[in-house]
Amino acid sequence: MKLLVTGAFTITAEQFDMLSSLGCEIMFQKDERGKPECDFSEADAVICNRLFLYHDISVFKNLKLIQLTSAGLDRVPIEEIKRRNIALFNARGVYSVPMAEFALSGVLSLYKHLNTFYESQKSHIWQKDRNLHELCGETIAIVGCGSVGTECAKRFSAFGTRVIAVDITKPKNEVYSDFYNIKDIKKALDIADVVVLTVPLTDETRNMFNKDMFSCFKENSVLVNISRGAVVNENDLINALESGKLSGAVLDVFKCEPLNADSKLWDIKNVIITPHNSFVSSKNNARLFSLVYDNIKNSMKGLV
């Protein structure tokens, strides 16, 4: 099997040897946007992230397997992959723990006014704040209860919160206190102190959180978006924040990345902005390689 590995996955010498021992002949494409550094038409399998945004899949004549380094499927030509019967794997579960920790830390930062204390520290000022909040007893709505959402639920639940699930189908995990079908999402938003978005980007979820949806949020609630930026209408979010409908937001993803320097979001009080970084962890490589190795091994055995 000829395996194309892009710069989206940093392969170690040990991992290279393990894949080679399976019978893989490994080719490299460091820059997914750049000109082909090898013959794409020879690749039987690909490990990538955004490769097919910059290179037409028709060039990959022999392609039988795609292993994405991302959890989302919005960067690949799904219909063509189905038509050609190409095995497609995402990185489900690989980034769930760091993303969940990130979501929780962001909310805690807002509730405990950590940014205020940080600014005081930089100026060498001893300034107390008597208006802090606690998570215990709050209601957390997780919109999208897959692997990331469920890991978020586990961590928020550990802080004594009531965690409710919002999804198409009811999750089997007992960490959720209640379930709302996505059709009834507005009922969930009305009672949630914190709303965490972990939904995939689809035609149905694009701009899902708009003016109409924000009007249903509980007063002074907090929005956390660690899914995809295009799920949220940013202008409507800005209005909801400036009007005081939302008391804060933790935003790791945006419709256009990098976020434009003149975006109002940068300067709104109680908004935490991070550069699509919530998934990062020193443990990701090992988790991802475990998936890669098993999927390629099974494919070569004809089990995929």
Each predicted region: which residue ranges?
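C-terminal helix-to-coil terminal segments
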Residues: F89-F102, T116, K255-V304
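Short beta->alpha connector loops at strand-helix junctions that form conserved
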Residues: K30, T69-S70, A87-V94, S227, ...
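Glycine-rich adenosine-cofactor-binding loop
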Residues: G7-F9, R92, H133-S157
